[in-house]
Amino acid sequence: MTSSLPVRAPSWVSSRRIFEERLQDLPKCANLNQVKQLHAQIIRRNLHEDLHIAPKLISALSLCRQTNLAVRVFNQVQEPNVHLCNSLIRAHAQNSQPYQAFFVFSEMQRFGLFADNFTYPFLLKACSGQSWLPVVKMMHNHIEKLGLSSDIYVPNALIDCYSRCGGLGVRDAMKLFEKMSERDTVSWNSMLGGLVKAGELRDARRLFDEMPQRDLISWNTMLDGYARCREMSKAFELFEKMPERNTVSWSTMVMGYSKAGDMEMARVMFDKMPLPAKNVVTWTIIIAGYAEKGLLKEADRLVDQMVASGLKFDAAAVISILAACTESGLLSLGMRIHSILKRSNLGSNAYVLNALLDMYAKCGNLKKAFDVFNDIPKKDLVSWNTMLHGLGVHGHGKEAIELFSRMRREGIRPDKVTFIAVLCSCNHAGLIDEGIDYFYSMEKVYDLVPQVEHYGCLVDLLGRVGRLKEAIKVVQTMPMEPNVVIWGALLGACRMHNEVDIAKEVLDNLVKLDPCDPGNYSLLSNIYAAAEDWEGVADIRSKMKSMGVEKPSGASSVELEDGIHEFTVFDKSHPKSDQIYQMLGSLIEPPDPGELVAVR
C-alpha cells in the first residue's frame, strides 16, 4: 500500500483565495484600515473599474462614514451603471447627506441611466422632515409614471418616508397604504410606526388590531407608542399579551415607567427582565432614570451591580447617565462616572468629554470643568461653548470673556450658540458696553444674523442697568416678533427698577402670548407691592382668580449623601416631615435671653 504526499497549492492560489474571501465580506466590513488595505490591493490588481467590486467598496466605505473616499471610488469608474450609482446614493443616504444623494441621481440621468426599483427607495431614505414633503410627493409621481409601484419594496419605502415627514406626511402615507392592492408585514409595520411617531395612538391601535399578521416589530412599535405618551397601564396590558419579548420590549417598559416618574415599577420590570435581555442599554436606562430623579443610593448601587456583572459602559451609556446627572444636579454620581472613565478607554472620546464638561459646568464645579476642558486634546466648538456658558451663568463673566478671546486667538470661529454664552457672561459681569459691541459684531464681523435669543440677551443686558428706553427701542425695532422670553426680560427689568407704568404695558403683551403663566402676574404684583400700590396688587390677584391662574408653591432642593431632597411650602410628603417642621420651629423661635452671649 503506497501513500501519496499532499500536493501543496502555489502561494499565489492561496493569496487569491484570501483576496476573494475578503471581497465577499467587504460590504459588511466597518474596519477602515482593513477596507483601505483591500482598496490598495484592488488598485494593484487593476480592478478599480470592476462594476462588481466598486459597489462593494462603496458600501464598506459608507459603513466607515467615509463618503468622500466612496465618491473617489465612484469617480474612478469611467462607465458607471445603475447598480454603482445606487450604491453611492445609498451611501449618502446612510450618512445623512440628502443633497449629495440627489446630486448623484442627477448625474445618473446625465449619464443616460434609468432609475430602477432600488434607486427611489435609496433616495427616499435620504429624506426626513416636513420640509422634504414636496420632494417626496414629486418622487411619488415619478414612481407612478415609471410603473415602479408594482414592486412592494417601493411603496413600502414611500410609506416609511412619508411617515418621517410629520403629521401631513402620515396622512399621505395612509392614503397610499389604503390604495395598496398588496401589503406585507413591512407595509403594516411602516404605517403603524408612522402613526405612533405622529402621536395618533387611536389610529395606531386600530391598525394594530386589524393586522393580519403581527411580528415582534409590530408589538414593540405599539408598545413604544404607549410608553412615549406615558400611557403605561395600556402599555403594561399590551406587554402582558405579547407572544414573545426581546430586549427592546423590556427596555421600552423600563424607559416608559422611568419617564413617567414611576421608578418603583421601572425597577420591578428591570428586575423581572431575563438575564440574557439585560445589556448595556437596559442598565443605562434604569441608572439614568434614578439619576434624573436625584436618587443617588439606588443609582450608585446599580452602577456597582452593572460593573460586577462584567458589562462595560460604552460612550452612549456614559453620555446618557451624565445628561441625567446634569438635569438633576446629581454631581456626586457624575464624579463617580468620571472615575470609571479614567480606568477605561473612553477617556479620550470627544463626545464623552464634552458631556462630562457639560455636567461639571452646569452643576457649578468650574474647577473640575476647567480640568476636563484642558484635558480635551482636540477641542471642538461644543467644548468651547460649554465652558463659556458654564462660566457665564455662574457669575464668572470676565473669565468667560477672556476665554472667548483665547478661543478667537486659537482660530476657532464662534457660532450663534457662542454669542448667547458671551452675551450672558457680559450680563452677569455687568459688562454692558462690551455686550452691546459683541451683539453688533455678530453680523458685522462674523456674518451671523442675531436670533430672538440674542435679542433677549440684549434686552436683559440693557434692562438690568436701568436703560429701559433703549431696551424698549430694541424690542420695537427687532426684525422678528418678540416672544415670551423678550417680554419676560423686560418685565424683570421693570421690577428691578420699579417702573410700574412700563410693567403694565409689558404684562399686556405677555398675557397675549401666554395668558396662563402665573409667574408674570406674580412679578407685576411684586412691582405694585414695591411701589406700595395695594390696589394694583388686589387687581392682579383678582385677575388671576377670575382666569383660574394659580401661583405654584415655591420649592428648594438640597443634595445630601443619599440623593437630592426637595421641599415645597407646606409640604408634608417627606418621610421625616415631622422632625423637619420641629427643627424649623426651633430655628424660628427667639432664643432665651439668658442664653445670649455678648460679642465684644
From Swiss-Prot:
PPR repeats lie at residues 50-80, 81-115, 116-150, 151-183, 184-218, 219-245, 246-276, 279-313, 314-348, 349-379, 380-414, 415-445, 451-481. InterPro entries: E_motif, Eplus_motif, Pentatricopeptide_rpt, PPR_At4g14850-like_plant, TPR-like_helical_dom_sf. Residues 486-561 are annotated as: Type E motif. Gene3D superfamilies: Tetratricopeptide repeat domain (1.25.40.10). Keywords: Repeat. Disulfide bonds: none annotated. It holds the Pfam family Eplus_motif. It comes from the Eukaryota. One of its GO terms (biological process) is RNA modification. Residues 562-592 are annotated as: Type E(+) motif. Belongs to the PPR family. PCMP-E subfamily. This is Pentatricopeptide repeat-containing protein At3g29230.
